[in-house]
Design a protein with these regions (language model features):
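Short, non-transmembrane alpha-helical segments in secretory-pathway proteins
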Residues: 1-28
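Amphipathic alpha-helical interface segments used for dimerization/assembly
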Residues: 11-14, 18, 40, 58-62
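Short, cysteine-centered beta-strand-loop-beta hairpins and adjacent loop/turn segments enriched
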Residues: 16-17, 43-54, 83
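Short secondary-structure boundary/capping segments within folded domains
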Residues: 27-30, 50-52
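A short, structured loop/turn motif at beta-sheet edges
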Residues: 30-35, 63-67
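A short hydrophobic beta-strand element
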Residues: 34-42
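A short, surface-exposed beta-strand/turn
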Residues: 50-76
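A short, polar/charged loop-to-alpha-helix boundary motif
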Residues: 78-86
């Protein structure tokens, strides 16, 4: 599956499984067996003021056929901490 298609599947999967809006794609990597590992950031809690949303990063694992092979929450952080390497 081409990367652009895998990203679309990962975005839809993360949104469907969490019920939350997707904020963006943080990382992509082939998994070595023809599939993909894609990190999708979703907004778990929107900030009331400013840019301090609570973001969760989910690892979406897609098999070579594009089917869901795994789904894990990797971390949670405040948007202001994103660039700080949190």
């Amino acid at each position: 599956m081409p990367l652009i298609e895998a990203i679309a599947v990962a975005r839809a999967t993360a949104s469907e499984l969490t019920g939350l809006p997707v904020d963006g794609i943080a990382a992509t990597a082939p998994d070595g067996s023809g599939g993909w590992r894609i990190t999708v950031d979703v907004i778990e809690s929107a900030a009331r003021m400013g840019e301090n949303d609570l973001i969760a990063s989910y690892e979406v694992h897609l098999g070579s056929d594009g089917g869901l092979a795994g789904f894990d929450r990797a971390r949670r952080y405040r948007r202001e901490d994103r660039e700080g390497g949190a």
